[in-house]
Each structure stands twice: as structure tokens, then as C-alpha cells.
Amino acid sequence: MVTIRLARGGSKKRPFYHLTVTNSRNARDGRFVERIGFFNPVATGGEVRLSVDQERATYWLAQGAQPSERVAQLLKDAAKANA
């Protein structure tokens, strides 16, 4: 099953996540099909907290990709920010 989920990056105590489309059997930070955005939970000042390619996210959801709970909330927040 194809899923949209977060892959962790960044350094210790300073997380950074990529929104990735991947097979659900792959490791969290392993192989992915496509990166469709990023999420920086510790963004400060002028840093961008969330960036999502809405067109690609919509495409993958239409193809049957299942978002994780956190990604579903982030996609909702991104749509609200763009509206």
C-alpha cells in the first residue's frame, strides 16, 4: 500500500521532516517514491514551518495513497494556509 508519511531528518534535538510518498513496508527513512514537501516543527523567525506541493499531494491521494494521521493534519493546515 502506498502511504504519505514523514521521514525524519535534521540533527539530534533539532528534527526536520520530509513529506514522502512511499510503500508502507519500507523503513521510515528508507526508500521513497517522491518527496512532496517538508515540515520544520522548530522553525523560528522567518523560517518556513510547512511547505507542501498541493498538486502532487492531491494526485497521490487520488491514486489511493493513505496519509498518516500527522500528515493528514498537516495537509489540512497547508490547505487552510493557502486558502
Curated annotation (Swiss-Prot):
GO cellular component: cytoplasm; small ribosomal subunit
UniProt-listed Gene3D superfamilies: 3.30.1320.10
GO biological-process terms attached to the record: translation
Molecular function in Gene Ontology: structural constituent of ribosome
Keywords: Ribonucleoprotein, Ribosomal protein
Similarity comment text for this entry: Belongs to the bacterial ribosomal protein bS16 family.
Protein name, per record: Small ribosomal subunit protein bS16
Organism, scientific name: Pseudomonas aeruginosa (strain UCBPP-PA14)
